[in-house]
Structure formats: C-alpha cells, structure tokens
A protein has these predicted regions:
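GH16 jelly-roll
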Residues: 1-201
Length: 201
C-alpha cells in the first residue's frame, strides 16, 4: 500500500477543529472501483476526521498526477484537500507545498459559491517569517460537490505547474527559477473541519 494514515490532535495546524484518527480512513468500493474514504464525524464535543500521505512509500518529481474525487458539501465548514509536500527533510515552508485542490474557503461560504470555488497554491520560503505563496482561487463554473467524481490534475515540469479539473485549466504557476519545486514530493489527502481557511472556529 502507498498510503499511511496520520494521527494528530485537534488544533494541530491552521486552527482546525478536528483531530485526525486512523479510524476515519477506510478502503471501500464505489462505482465498482476501490476507493479511499475519508470521513469527518462529530463525537460529543469532538470532531475526528481522516488524513493520509504517501511519505516514505511513493514520491514524485515532474509528470502528471491526478485523482478522481467525490467531495462533500463544504458550506458548513468542511475543508477537503488534495496536495503535496516536499521531501527535502526541511520544515514548512522550506519543504515546499503544492495545493492541487482545496475547497471550502471563507469567501466561497460567504458568497454562496463554495461548491464551485477551487483554491490552488504554491507555498515556499526559508522559514515561517519568510513564507511566500503563489495563489489562485476562483469559481470554475462547475458544481464539484454534486455527488459525482471529478478529476483533479497536476501537470508538472521544469518550468510550470498547471492545475485543472475535468480537463479544464484552472491556473498555471511559473516555477522556472523557483528551487523549491524541483525535487521529490509526496501526496496527501485530508478532510479538515473549520479553521483559518474556512473562517469557522
């Protein structure tokens, strides 16, 4: 298996409300295919959810990386993400981060476009104080939370990182002279709840 389940306490990062538990990640069947299922559940006054990564098992440098994902409705504070982190053994953001798809941001919740508004970004820099980012967020015109699978694609070469959904280009980042994005990265999937991104605490 290429995936490791993560465990973290609530509030571990980004002021998120959930704790991550291995029990919230399952392998199942849907539409005849084997799928990873990440679930967020309220247990009393606590929320637990799922997060997996391919660190130590599968790395990528350049190429085409895509995932077919069925998303929940995010207007209530759910924050699903398909992303990557660098494996240079540096702390964030010096490791580099590629956010292929994030949904559920505060702006989308506020203006009623949460089901169509996709965020994609690059994060990098020598340390937290020197954090830089390239960022795109926009209404793609598709309901990506309609109960169907949608395909999110990263195309990555020496010059560009391009992100698309269902073969529709969302954004292209120029990385020609950005040393943070020319090394091995691993993949993560998670379902966060609340926090700074959603504006729900």
């Amino acid at each position: 298996a290429y995936w490791s389940k993560e465990t973290h306490e609530a509030g571990w990062t980004n002021q998120e409300l959930q704790a991550y538990s291995t029990g919230q990640v399952k392998v199942g069947k849907d539409d005849g295919k084997t799928v990873l299922i990440l679930t967020a559940t309220r247990k009393g006054d606590k929320i637990v959810s799922g997060r997996v990564n391919s660190k130590g098992k599968k790395y990528f440098k350049y190429g085409k990386i895509e995932a077919s994902i069925k998303l929940p409705r995010t207007a209530n504070g759910l924050w699903p993400a398909f992303w990557m982190m660098g494996n240079n053994r540096q702390e964030w953001p010096a490791c580099g981060e590629i956010d292929i798809m994030e949904m559920g941001d505060a702006q989308g919740i506020a203006d009623g476009t949460s089901a169509r508004r996709v965020n994609t970004a690059l994060h990098y820099g020598p340390d937290v104080a020197g954090h830089e980012q390239q960022y795109y967020a926009g209404d793609c015109g598709l309901d990506l939370q309609d109960g169907a699978y949608h395909t999110y694609t990263l195309k990555w070469n020496e010059n560009n990182i391009e992100v698309s959904v269902d073969n529709m280009k969302l954004h292209s980042f120029d990385i020609t002279d950005n040393a943070y994005f020319h090394s091995d990265f691993f993949i993560l999937f998670n379902l966060a709840v609340g926090g700074a991104f959603t504006g729900i605490y």
